[in-house]
């Protein structure tokens, strides 16, 4: 079985458009720099076609073993497809342990099936940057920035909690001195002025505004009876049947003659009803002959 079995056919439509865009990002100048670097480290010739020379994974495994000895334990020299894919997989695992980020690493099919040579080139450039960071003399890639860690004593860290950073703005030298807890009473006087004893509770401070001389004298608790007369005038025993003008006018109406709710009410006035003068039944003056009585059989 030859490696041509894994080569894909031509792409069409959207797949062809994506493949062309990826191919346009491929940098041939970077390819030449990577070729010189890999050949200089391994001492082996890659060949005319750069990607085809790396396709079996043998040179890649030897290359990572030079950068990090013992990274790949076994390198398959066979021409079988699965052996070549195994070499590429071992190379990917080795550079991951070496420090290359997973999102910078290509997939095995990107190289073996010629699907994304641009990603393969990006992975080799990331490997060059990591090698330069570790101290290898490489003319390819960019050296990663080193971490600048700072360690502070616990006392310094505690002092920093009391400082308001300029990123939060400025408090214009204001403080919370004299502030009380949420919901507690706040005094509206200054102890430095000798007015520690507050005024009586009946006096409304000017800081609260003015009540225009009004007071709560004569006010009663909610729900209690309120007298609508002046005690000084001796009007405590007024007639409770009279409706005060403060409540409106009843137009002279009263409840005289009204009965308790539910009792029968007489709908006639005795002044307009005459008393009968003829003798009633059973009285001596009653004429019994004027009436006919029949026995009910």
From Swiss-Prot:
Spans of repeat Calponin-like: 164-189, 204-229, 243-268
CDD domains, sorted: CH_CNN1
SMART domains: CH
Residues with Phosphothreonine modification: 170, 180, 184, 259
Modified residues (Phosphoserine): 175
Stretch forming the signal peptide: none
Tissue: Smooth muscle, and tissues containing significant amounts of smooth muscle.
GO annotation terms (biological process): actin filament organization; actomyosin structure organization; negative regulation of vascular associated smooth muscle cell proliferation; regulation of smooth muscle contraction
Coiled-coil segments on the chain, per record: none
Keywords, alphabetical: Actin-binding, Calmodulin-binding, Phosphoprotein, Repeat
Residue span(s) of domain Calponin-homology (CH): 28-131
UniProt xrefs under InterPro entries: Calponin-like (IPR050606), Calponin/LIMCH1 (IPR001997), Calponin_repeat (IPR000557), CH_dom (IPR001715), CH_dom_sf (IPR036872), SM22_calponin (IPR003096)
GO molecular function: actin filament binding; calmodulin binding
Gene Ontology CC entries for this record: actin cytoskeleton; cytoskeleton; focal adhesion
Sequence similarity: Belongs to the calponin family.
Description of how the protein assembles with itself and partners: Part of cGMP kinase signaling complex at least composed of ACTA2/alpha-actin, CNN1/calponin H1, PLN/phospholamban, PRKG1 and ITPR1.
Function: Thin filament-associated protein that is implicated in the regulation and modulation of smooth muscle contraction. It is capable of binding to actin, calmodulin and tropomyosin. The interaction of calponin with actin inhibits the actomyosin Mg-ATPase activity.
Protein's name according to its UniProt entry: Calponin-1
Native source organism of the sequence: Homo sapiens (Human)
Protein's gene: CNN1
């Amino acid at each position: 079985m030859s490696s041509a079995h894994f080569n894909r056919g031509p792409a069409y439509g959207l797949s062809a458009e994506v493949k062309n865009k990826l191919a346009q990002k491929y940098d041939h100048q970077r390819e030449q720099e990577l070729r010189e670097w890999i050949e200089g480290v391994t001492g082996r010739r890659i060949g005319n076609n750069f990607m085809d020379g790396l396709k079996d994974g043998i040179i890649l495994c030897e290359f990572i073993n030079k950068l990090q000895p013992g990274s790949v334990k076994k390198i398959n020299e066979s021409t079988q497809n699965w052996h070549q894919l195994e070499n590429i997989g071992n190379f990917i695992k080795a550079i991951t342990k070496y420090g290359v980020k997973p999102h910078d690493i290509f997939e095995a099919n990107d190289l073996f099936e010629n699907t994304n040579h641009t990603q393969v080139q990006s992975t080799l450039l990331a490997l060059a940057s990591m090698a330069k960071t570790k101290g290898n003399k490489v003319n390819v890639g960019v050296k990663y920035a080193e971490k600048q860690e700072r360690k502070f004593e616990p006392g310094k860290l505690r002092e920093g909690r009391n400082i308001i950073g300029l990123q939060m703005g400025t408090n214009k030298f204001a403080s919370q001195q004299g502030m009380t807890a949420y919901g507690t009473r706040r005094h509206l006087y200054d102890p430095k002025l000798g007015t520690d004893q507050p005024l009586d509770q009946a006096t409304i401070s000017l800081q609260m505004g003015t009540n225009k001389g009004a007071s709560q004298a004569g006010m009663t608790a909610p729900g209690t009876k309120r007298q609508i007369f002046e005690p000084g005038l001796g009007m405590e025993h007024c007639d409770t049947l009279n409706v005060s003008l403060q409540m409106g006018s009843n137009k002279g109406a009263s409840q005289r003659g009204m009965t308790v709710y539910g009792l029968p009410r007489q709908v006639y006035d005795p002044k307009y009803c005459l008393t009968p003068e003829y003798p009633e039944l059973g009285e001596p003056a009653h004429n019994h002959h004027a009436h006919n009585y029949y026995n009910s059989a």
